[in-house]
Amino acid sequence: MISTPLSKEFEWPAKPVSLELQHQVEQFYYREAQLLDHHAFQAWFALLAEDIHYWMPIRTVRTAREQGLEYVPAGANAHFDDTHATMYGRIRQKTSDLNWAEDPPSRTRHLVSNVIVREMDTPGTLEVASAFLLYRSRLERQVDVFAGERRDVLRIADNPLGFQIAKRTIILDQSTVLANNLSVFF
């Protein structure tokens, strides 16, 4: 079996984090969603760590015995495989007057739930799994719904929201993306 970064399930914490930390992480996600839904892309970009890895692997349909091959391995083709520099380019494109894929802009609603926080061995670093639902309305009749799981590595940071995103893996539930484009951020 090919080993992929998703071969290992999210490691549940031995004990829950404090209610205060859980609340802080959830509030961070709610504010992040609001930034994206209100097209505050520069403010959202400021939440990304310099060493960010923003990855959405391609998912394939496999039989029960081939579930370990469901996702493409790291380094293979992916919907997104971005660094800080490529995310900056996507933000610049999205906010320019020449962004044909997003003119007029999409209207989005990011919903985040089922947030599970685990403190990592490195102080100030958290591993977080969450469920998401992203609704996008575009033009007059185009509607897209994306559902899945995000696996993030957050670092405590000196910014207004208290954290920065060091890694985001987006695991779509659907294997075939029916949307005209993927010009949204998850």
Swiss-Prot record:
Gene Ontology BP annotations: 3-phenylpropionate catabolic process
GO molecular function, one term: biphenyl 2,3-dioxygenase activity
Class of enzymatic activity (EC top level): oxidoreductase
Gene3D superfamilies given in the database record: 3.10.450.50
Superkingdom of the organism of origin: Bacteria
Pathway stated in the Swiss-Prot or TrEMBL entry: Xenobiotic degradation; biphenyl degradation; 2-hydroxy-2,4-pentadienoate and benzoate from biphenyl: step 1/4
EC numbers, comma separated: 1.14.12.18
Catalytic activities: biphenyl + NADH + O2 + H(+) = (2R,3S)-3-phenylcyclohexa-3,5-diene-1,2-diol + NAD(+)
InterPro entries: NTF2-like_dom_sf, Rng_hydr_dOase-bsu
Record-linked Pfam families: Ring_hydroxyl_B
Keywords attached to this entry: Aromatic hydrocarbons catabolism, Dioxygenase, NAD, Oxidoreductase
TM segment ranges: none
Quaternary state and interactors: Heterohexamer consisting of 3 BphA subunits and 3 BphE subunits. A ferredoxin (BphF) and a ferredoxin reductase (BphG) must be present to obtain activity.
Family: Belongs to the bacterial ring-hydroxylating dioxygenase beta subunit family.
Role, per record: The beta subunit may be responsible for the substrate specificity of the enzyme.
Protein name: Biphenyl dioxygenase subunit beta
